[in-house]
Regions:
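Membrane metalloprotein/metal-transporter helix-bundle signature
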Residues: 2-191
Length: 191
């Protein structure tokens, strides 16, 4: 049985969450994005709803399996393209917040399932959740390739870090994160 101590991670995680909460509100994540690599890199990290959904994707991948990440990539590319081309989704802000809850619910439901997780269903939920967020990015972002590169790298960093941490963490930690995501998404949806 493998033991994993969370103690060395508490300070960096607390500092990161504290900085995120101080610097980001859901409404700020969907303002007009400025051009440039730095703006693109920071956008998915400083927008609380974007940060939480990316942590959720990493959590789902860590709990279910890394195959989920391919679904997330497809959702990100499709959503960004639709948004960049002027596509509109009524209620996208509400759906983006509820997508955070969906990530938590997917983990919790998978843990309770006696048949094990169904990759196709879980992957579709992840792809749709990320597509909504990427659509909003596509609507608001400049056409700058450096902005998109920064956003892709920032998103990859958050998903990769949360995947690495939660894949190694004890199941109860992953379930606690999933429960927090479930509540946070609903809270942001109705804030």
């Amino acid at each position: 049985m493998r033991f994993f101590s969370v103690r060395p991670l508490l300070l960096p995680v607390a500092a990161g969450l504290g900085l995120s909460l101080l610097s980001a509100l859901p409404a700020q994540a969907h303002g007009i994005a400025t051009a440039g690599f730095g703006a693109g890199f920071s956008h998915p990290i400083t927008g609380l709803d974007h940060l939480l959904v990316l942590v959720g994707v990493g959590g789902v991948a860590g709990f279910i399996g890394s195959s989920v990440l391919l679904f997330a990539l497809v959702g990100a590319v499709a959503g960004a393209m639709v948004g960049s081309l002027g596509g509109v989704l009524p209620g996208a802000e509400l759906l983006a917040a509820l997508a955070i809850s969906a990530m938590g619910v997917v983990i919790l439901a998978s843990q309770r399932s006696s048949r094990g997780p169904r990759l196709e269903l879980i992957g579709t939920v992840v792809a749709l959740a990320i597509a909504v967020h990427a659509l909003l990015h596509g609507q608001e972002a400049s056409g700058s390739a450096s902005w998109w590169l920064g956003a892709a790298l920032g998103s990859t960093l958050v998903v990769g870090a949360s995947y690495a941490l939660l894949a190694q963490a004890h199941t109860r930690w992953t379930l606690a994160v999933a429960a927090a995501l479930s509540v946070a998404g609903v809270a942001l949806a109705f804030a």
